[in-house]
């Protein structure tokens, strides 16, 4: 490809709404163009990268034995009502009515459609297991699209769905897909972690997420510094601890006028937040509950949902009607059940509210207090790993893949049955496996860039090498050598870009670096005199003189 035949709308500055580096560089390098909030067009350079990502995914999925299909993005409401998700999914599901007054939606995912296909065509246990995948557009009406292609409304996803006669078969395919995802992300050159995860609105039991480590990530992940343990922060489980402290203080009440936050109270009383207990009041189906946590810990809402089902934080009026004072709630004289986090239940001589406006208690202990202890909190950096090996490190991550063991969540309600070996109908067991295709590019850039631009790997770079001929349109010798080398690369199946523009060499260099092309060859009249070319790798600073006749073989060694 020659640059004069290619749209490369590079920019010196990124738009003001581009807050993270991947968004800035994808705009500046001309990979994408914003159409509306959460909607982006992929330009020719971006398409080249996108297709290479898709090809790697497709190759590994095919190698795993999965079969490619393509399902409509427009889905009839009947399927979603049948699964029970039509009303549960929320505002992210874009619903519409066609000219015949029939209800449809734009698919944010395809569990219903694939289950419908399975019940049409899978009849016998002899056909199982069967794994289908597609690379298809999705639409989720995100309330707050941001970070460029990381959180879009319309995006491309690889989603796969497997069908099995039993849990044992599902486990086998799940392990195959786990390894397949590792192969994909390894080939893409991503620094990632695999974590235990919550299944969210998709449903199911066992679930793993694949996170690319990046400071701009929206997710918080935890992993041990001494073992392979890793989990989404919402999934880290803690266990009951042995109490090791002994009380040495006499409980007393102190004036803490207008000090309603743990931060303010700990500073005012000159105690660490770890020695404070905070109380949260929640409303559940059958009443109210008081939740007690250590002052330096945060509530894990998923754990609370798992304990009590749907819940809400109580309003100021509800707290007042319970006879409590917001900001001064304590553990004593409560008329509602008290649930105490494991880490708070082993404290001695702690600070908590006095259930009286402008007062707190110090030197408080649990003796005589009726409560139930449970795991209520999120992990923090330095916590002991749940597997007993090492301590937890907490990092930000961008989720690029998620695999689920769905079980019979969809197949049972949609009657995706097969005839089993006994001759009786058996409900199929399902797995679900997703990769955010468009998100991968941004995640890669977050990990691979410098002040000059993107640093693509050979696997997904728009071009493997760029030839920059100085005075290409003035020097016949330079043009002849550049054209000759260009043809050699093409014949060797090397993805090459020849910069044949009438531009200053500085602009040509800047564009090639911004685009992240891994290898660069420079040819000038001086090089023509010497029978050589200049080579530079995008991720290196040094330049190498290479004999012109050796240039092809030299580059081929770099491609290995």
Swiss-Prot record:
Its EC number is 6.1.1.15. It is found in: Cytoplasm. It catalyses: tRNA(Pro) + L-proline + ATP = L-prolyl-tRNA(Pro) + AMP + diphosphate. Keywords: Aminoacyl-tRNA synthetase, ATP-binding, Cytoplasm, Ligase, Nucleotide-binding, Protein biosynthesis. Gene3D superfamilies: Anticodon-binding domain, Bira Bifunctional Protein, Domain 2. It holds the Pfam family tRNA-synt_2b. InterPro entries: aa-tRNA-synt_IIb (IPR002314), aa-tRNA-synth_II (IPR006195), aa-tRNA-synth_II/BPL/LPL (IPR045864), Anticodon-bd (IPR004154), Anticodon-bd_dom_sf (IPR036621), Pro-tRNA-ligase_IIa (IPR002316), Pro-tRNA-synth_IIa_bac-type (IPR004500), Pro-tRNA-Synthase_IIa_type1 (IPR023717). One of its GO terms (cellular component) is cytosol. GO terms for biological process: prolyl-tRNA aminoacylation. GO terms for molecular function: aminoacyl-tRNA deacylase activity; ATP binding; proline-tRNA ligase activity. It is an enzyme of class 6 (ligase). PANTHER family: MITOCHONDRIAL RIBOSOME PROTEIN L39/PROLYL-TRNA LIGASE FAMILY MEMBER (PTHR42753), PROLINE--TRNA LIGASE (PTHR42753:SF2). Belongs to the class-II aminoacyl-tRNA synthetase family. ProS type 1 subfamily. HAMAP family: Pro_tRNA_synth_type1. Homodimer. Catalyzes the attachment of proline to tRNA(Pro) in a two-step reaction: proline is first activated by ATP to form Pro-AMP and then transferred to the acceptor end of tRNA(Pro). As ProRS can inadvertently accommodate and process non-cognate amino acids such as alanine and cysteine, to avoid such errors it has two additional distinct editing activities against alanine. One activity is designated as 'pretransfer' editing and involves the tRNA(Pro)-independent hydrolysis of activated Ala-AMP. NCBIfam families: PRK09194.1, proS_fam_II. Consists of three domains: the N-terminal catalytic domain, the editing domain and the C-terminal anticodon-binding domain. This is Proline--tRNA ligase. It comes from Vesicomyosocius okutanii subsp. Calyptogena okutanii (strain HA).
């Amino acid at each position: 490809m020659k640059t004069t035949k290619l749209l490369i709308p590079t920019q010196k500055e990124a738009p003001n709404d581009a807050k993270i580096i991947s968004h800035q560089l994808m705009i500046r390098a001309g990979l994408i163009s914003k159409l509306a909030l959460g909607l982006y067009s992929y330009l020719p350079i971006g398409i080249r990268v996108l297709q290479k990502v898709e090809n790697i995914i497709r190759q590994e999925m095919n190698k795993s034995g999965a079969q490619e299909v393509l399902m409509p993005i427009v889905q009839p409401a009947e399927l979603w009502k049948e699964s029970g998700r039509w009303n549960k999914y929320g505002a992210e599901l874009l619903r519409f009515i066609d000219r015949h007054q029939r209800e449809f939606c734009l698919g944010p995912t395809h569990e219903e459609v694939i289950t419908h296909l399975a019940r049409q065509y899978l009849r016998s246990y002899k056909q199982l297991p069967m794994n289908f995948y597609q690379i298809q557009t999705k639409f989720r009406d995100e309330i707050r699209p941001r970070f460029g292609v990381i959180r879009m409304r319309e995006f491309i996803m690889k989603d796969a769905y497997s069908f099995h006669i039993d849990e044992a078969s599902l486990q086998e395919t799940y392990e195959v897909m786990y390894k397949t995802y590792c192969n994909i992300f390894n080939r893409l050159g991503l620094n990632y972690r695999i974590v235990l995860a919550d299944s969210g609105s998709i449903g199911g039991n066992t679930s793993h997420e694949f996170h690319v480590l990046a400071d701009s990530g929206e997710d918080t992940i935890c992993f041990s510094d001494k073992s392979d343990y890793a989990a989404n922060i919402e999934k880290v489980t803690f266990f009951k601890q042995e109490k090791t402290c002994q009380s040495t203080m006499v409980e007393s009440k102190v004036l803490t006028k207008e000090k309603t936050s743990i931060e303010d109270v700990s500073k005012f009383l000159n105690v660490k937040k770890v020695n404070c207990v905070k109380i949260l009041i929640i409303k559940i189906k059958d009443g109210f509950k008081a939740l007690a946590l250590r002052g330096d810990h945060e509530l894990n809402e998923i754990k609370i949902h798992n304990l009590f089902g749907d819940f809400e934080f109580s309003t100021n009026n509800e707290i007042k009607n319970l006879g409590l004072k917001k900001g001064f709630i304590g553990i004593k004289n409560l008329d509602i059940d008290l649930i105490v986090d494991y880490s708070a239940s082993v404290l001695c001589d702690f600070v908590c509210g006095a259930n009286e406006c402008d007062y707190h208690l110090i030197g408080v202990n649990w003796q005589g207090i009726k409560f139930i202890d449970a795991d209520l909190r999120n992990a923090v950096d330095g916590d002991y790993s749940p597997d007993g090996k090492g301590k937890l490190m907490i990092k930000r991550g961008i989720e690029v893949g998620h695999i689920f063991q769905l079980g019979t969540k969809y197949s049972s309600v949609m009657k995706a049955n097969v005839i089993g070996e006994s001759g009786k109908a058996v409900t199929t067991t399902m797995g679900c496996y997703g990769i955010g295709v468009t998100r991968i590019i941004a995640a890669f850039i977050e990990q691979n860039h410098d002040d000059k631009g993107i640093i693509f790997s050979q696997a997904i770079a728009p071009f493997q090498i760029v030839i920059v001929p100085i005075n290409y349109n003035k020097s016949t010798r330079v043009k002849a050598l550049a054209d000759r080398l260009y043809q050699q690369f093409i014949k060797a199946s090397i993805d090459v870009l020849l910069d044949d523009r009438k531009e200053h060499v500085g602009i040509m260099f800047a564009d090639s670096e911004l685009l992240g092309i891994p290898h660069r060859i420079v040819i000038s009249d001086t090089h023509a005199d010497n029978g050589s070319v200049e080579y530079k790798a995008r991720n290196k600073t040094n330049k190498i003189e290479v004999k012109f006749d050796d240039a092809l073989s030299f580059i081929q060694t770099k491609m290995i």
